[in-house]
């Protein structure tokens, strides 16, 4: 009898793990559970969940094979990290999870006992120290798997940021580093500084990206490809605005509505057009989950893509997992991209973005496509 018996078949493809990036060998679920809704302090802003419903969603994700949870020091005025920490401790599964959290924002915004907030904000060594200390306590853990710089502050130097982050890695309090909501040139400079000085570089970039809003593709994706970084799209489902006309009407009738991150919960014309295209492709691939198609689109665009799926309902989570079973044709990808204009801008319009040869190179001869790492091929779980 072999010692190397394969494990049981995972309940869903959340349990078919992928290497995080070419620069990080840890294996994680292909879809992250976004914890922006987990916690009970943001009901007026984007919805919130009590502890029982939070634990139920976390249970559903973990029991489906998921191990990659994304939170932040400031989410739900700190209750997101607190609920996750309490849940993981109660289940005794901390080391089975890959937990990402973030610093930069004022996580004491909702704390009335704090009168001076400036030292809790930004990317300084002081802010970083306070935030990580608090996150470890709230998450009830001795280490953070992935720490993101949440937002570039244009105040703290690259040198201070990278040296301060490296001390956290050396201390064992943080294992991997990520960066979010930051210009591509800053990330490139920061990683080059890290390499030049034997410091820990960033291995993943988190930013806004979906089939409707593709600014991410201009500078961020080419930068990540060159740096060997993974991509973690937030706003992958346009803040919940990708839905069918029938679903929107149902919400209107029942009064359920949806998130109000903008002036209204209802979709605008652009969101309706993209939703219709997603619904058409969904029918072609045999699913009624337009959100799953939107996620599958991102997974088909580049390697090492780990979309963040939020929400508060277990049924929505399970519907989104269907994205891992969807294989989109090149024609379907082009159809989804055709409904909203997208321009690479300068200089991409002139030279391309590295994923294919630009007009200047094509004018000189017939060329084989560039040799690039390809996205994972989606397939059914056997």
Model segments located where?
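N-terminal binding-site loop/beta-alpha segment at the start of enzyme catalytic domains
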Residues: 1-98, 142, 376-382
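Active-site beta-loop-alpha junctions enriched in small/polar residues
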Residues: 36-38, 74, 102-106, 149-152, ...
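Glycine/proline-rich, positively charged
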Residues: 110-215, 219
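Short, well-ordered coil/turn segments that N-cap beta-strands
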Residues: 26-31, 65-68, 93-97, 141-145, ...
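Aromatic-lined glycan-binding groove of carbohydrate-active enzymes
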Residues: 215-255
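Conserved, mostly hydrophobic/aromatic
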Residues: 33, 54, 69, 84, ...
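Terminal-tail/helix-coil boundary detector
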Residues: 2-16, 226, 252-285, 300, ...
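Generic structural signal for well-ordered alpha-helices
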Residues: 17, 58, 81, 85, ...
């Amino acid at each position: 009898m072999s010692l190397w018996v394969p494990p049981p078949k995972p309940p869903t493809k959340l349990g078919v793990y992928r290497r995080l990036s070419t620069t990080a060998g840890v294996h994680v679920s292909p879809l992250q559970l976004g914890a922006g809704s987990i916690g009970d302090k943001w009901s007026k802003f984007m919805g919130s969940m009590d502890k029982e419903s939070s634990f139920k969603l976390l249970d559903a994700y973990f029991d489906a094979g998921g191990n990659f949870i994304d939170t932040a020091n400031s989410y739900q005025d700190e209750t997101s990290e607190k609920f996750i920490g309490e849940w993981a401790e109660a289940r005794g599964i901390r080391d089975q999870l890959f937990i990402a959290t973030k610093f930069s924002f004022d996580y004491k915004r909702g704390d009335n006992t704090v009168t001076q907030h400036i030292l809790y904000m930004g990317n300084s060594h002081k802010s970083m120290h306070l935030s990580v200390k608090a996150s470890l306590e709230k998450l009830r853990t001795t280490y953070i798997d992935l720490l993101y710089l949440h937002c570039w502050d244009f105040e703290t130097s690259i040198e201070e940021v990278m040296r301060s982050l490296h001390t956290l890695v050396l201390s064992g309090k943080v294992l991997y580093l990520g960066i979010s909501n930051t210009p591509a040139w800053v990330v490139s400079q920061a990683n080059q500084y890290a390499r030049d000085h034997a410091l820990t570089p960033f291995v993943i970039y988190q930013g806004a990206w979906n089939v409707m809003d593709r600014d991410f593709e201009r500078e961020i994706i080419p930068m990540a490809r060159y740096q060997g970084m993974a991509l973690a799209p937030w706003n992958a489902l346009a803040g919940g605005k990708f839905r069918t006309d029938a679903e929107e009407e149902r919400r209107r009738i029942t009064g359920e509505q949806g998130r109000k991150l903008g002036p209204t919960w209802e979709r605008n014309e652009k969101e309706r057009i993209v939703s219709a295209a997603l619904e058409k492709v969904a029918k072609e691939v045999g699913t009624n989950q337009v959100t799953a198609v939107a996620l599958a689109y991102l997974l088909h665009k580049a390697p090492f893509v780990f979309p963040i799926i939020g929400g508060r309902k277990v049924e929505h989570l399970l519907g989104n997992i269907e994205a891992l079973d969807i294989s989109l044709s090149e024609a379907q990808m082009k159809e989804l991209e055709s409904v909203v204009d997208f321009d690479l801008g300068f200089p991409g319009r002139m030279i391309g973005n590295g994923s294919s040869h630009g007009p200047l190179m094509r004018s000189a001869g017939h060329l084989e496509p560039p040799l690039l790492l390809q996205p994972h091929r989606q397939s059914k779980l056997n």
